[in-house]
């Protein structure tokens, strides 16, 4: 028999699920799974949210849902697919730059999310979600610096060179997917010229945009394990609606444990 707390959590979950559908302006499928990351399948229109061991705050729930709805509204499947067919190693770079664009657009569209996003990122920082507690942030790659600065802002103390600041400003200025792709390619080329990365590098895990119909591992060192298609998830998933769908193209967020 469900406890009052469990019933309250289920009610909140259902309310947030319905809100996500309304925000996305379409009948997307919302599921809850025992997975380490949240993702949105932009091909099959499925939003999956992890089931945390502890209760998820309303603000964190809003961040997860708001971010994924941002991809539902603004990230083009064909654009992502084409870019990765051309160069698979762009995955991490495309993800970070696109996150900047869609989070800005979803906050502009739904101004009430601004406060939730701010509080949720505070919560993530308090739980060392990005794994930076004992890191020298100045030694991070440019793409990881951009990922942190654009998500948590002044909560991290990272200094950029004039050249790096120009690139960051370009990320903030992206309005279209084509601009995202161009800036991601610029960062990728800059990194090849100015940085050394290998499989031992520990990048800061971004909220990742996935193409599940790609099976090969990413060889760029950009957190390969965060690029799976979600098909190996255990059957303990809880689905809030009866809609059908797979998980070919996803956006993921790492777990808080």
Question: How would you describe each model-predicted region?
Answer:
Residues 1-257:
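Short, functionally important secondary-structure microenvironments
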């Amino acid at each position: 028999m469900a406890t009052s707390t469990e019933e309250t959590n289920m009610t909140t979950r259902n309310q947030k699920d319905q809100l996500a559908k309304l925000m996305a302006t379409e009948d997307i499928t919302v599921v809850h799974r025992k997975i380490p990351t949240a993702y949105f399948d932009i091909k099959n229109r499925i939003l999956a949210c992890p089931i945390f061991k502890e209760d998820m705050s309303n603000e964190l729930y809003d961040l997860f849902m708001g971010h994924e709805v941002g991809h539902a509204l603004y990230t083009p499947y064909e654009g992502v697919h084409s870019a990765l067919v051309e160069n698979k190693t762009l995955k991490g770079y495309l993800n970070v730059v696109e996150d900047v664009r869609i989070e800005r657009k979803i906050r502009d569209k739904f101004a009430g999310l601004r406060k939730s996003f701010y509080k949720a990122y505070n919560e993530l920082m308090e739980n060392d979600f990005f794994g930076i507690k004992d890191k020298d942030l100045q030694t991070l790659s440019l793409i990881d610096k951009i990922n942190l600065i654009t998500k948590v802002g002044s909560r991290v103390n990272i200094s950029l060179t004039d050249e790096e600041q120009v690139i960051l400003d370009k990320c903030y200025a992206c309005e279209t997917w084509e601009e995202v792709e161009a800036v991601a390619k610029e960062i990728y080329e800059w990194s090849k010229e100015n940085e050394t990365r290998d499989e031992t590098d520990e990048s800061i895990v971004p909220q990742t945009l996935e193409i599940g119909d790609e099976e090969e591992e990413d060889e760029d060192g950009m957190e390969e394990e965060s690029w799976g298609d979600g098909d190996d998830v255990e059957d303990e998933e809880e689905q809030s609606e009866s809609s059908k769908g797979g998980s070919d193209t996803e956006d993921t967020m790492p777990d808080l444990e």
